Amino acid sequence: MADNLEPLEPSLQNLVEQDSLKWIFVGGKGGVGKTTCSSSLAVQLSKVRESVLIISTDPAHNISDAFDQKFTKVPTKVNGFDNLFAMEIDPNAGLNELPEEYFDGENEALRVSKGVMQEMINALPGIDEAMSYAEVMKLVKGMNFSVVVFDTAPTGHTLRLIAFPQVVEKGLGKLLRLKMKVAPLLSQFVSMLGMADVNADTLSQKLDDMLRVITQVNEQFKNPDQTTFVCVCIAEFFSLYETERLVQELTKCGIDVHNIIVNQLLFLQKSHDSCSMCASRFKIQEKYLDQIADLYEDFHVTKLPLLEKEVRGPESIRSFSENLMKPYDPKAEPKE
């Protein structure tokens, strides 16, 4: 039966045309070109969506290099685009990575809450990184972007990112259960410091608000109409092994994944002589491409070329992004 099935379109056109998608994650092993692929996908989405945000959660922050423009923890418009924005967060920095404006208020209550919240969170192992994502999600949801693309860190960090809603829900649940015990102590503490306008209700309300947002995000992450994951790999053993592990973990978490990008491929022309190394690499890639075809026959598998020049700058990414929408044809490559 499976042999009679038509192969799925070898592109990301299915994602670009799925206008219900809200969150798109792009991830894989380090060094496979995730940032180029996620940036290219964001560019294509900007053609059909009202507003697009790409977020780097990789401490290396490669999207600044990709677009040749410095980005910060505040969404910034990408040069050359009217509706594409980018921001970079460091998941290891916890709440300290958030824009200060987030904690602005008419008094010092929210600023004090930031410090108190950080201390309380530090008492719960493993939740700090997750809380950073949680706060970013709260910020992003308030900005009403049509779709958000995550340029994720290598696989281990990515799996933690995917799991963060459950971690935060569990952690916040513990904090809120302790709320009644903590509130009187916190009120006494701030009164001793002469800050009568600060009370535990401020912190409590903030935690309640965050839990509500994260519960909603958790539901959206597991809804294939709203969230999907794009795996990026190269045609080598370790990358393919990591991709299979990632696909299995995503499936276990209930995250939709049906697109794989195989990057940095050689497209040798039989009519041209090639060096022995190129021919050897080509054979290796062909072997793993066959394995990918067998493993992921029910996936959209997009094949991208290894280029002579690096893909950097908005115009270069805009040009490269076309390869996501239709199969790459080396014969159609413009001659210089």
Swiss-Prot record:
SUPFAM superfamilies: P-loop containing nucleoside triphosphate hydrolases. Zn(2+) binds at C275, C278. InterPro entries: Anion-transp_ATPase-like_dom, ATPase_ArsA/GET3, ATPase_ArsA/GET3_euk, P-loop_NTPase. It is found in: Cytoplasm; Endoplasmic reticulum. GO terms for molecular function: ATP binding; ATP hydrolysis activity; metal ion binding. GO terms for cellular component: GET complex. Its EC number is 3.6.-.-. It is an enzyme of class 3 (hydrolase). The active site is at D58. ATPase required for the post-translational delivery of tail-anchored (TA) proteins to the endoplasmic reticulum. Recognizes and selectively binds the transmembrane domain of TA proteins in the cytosol. This complex then targets to the endoplasmic reticulum by membrane-bound receptors, where the tail-anchored protein is released for insertion. This process is regulated by ATP binding and hydrolysis. ATP binding drives the homodimer towards the closed dimer state, facilitating recognition of newly synthesized TA membrane proteins. ATP hydrolysis is required for insertion. Belongs to the arsA ATPase family. This is ATPase ASNA1 homolog.
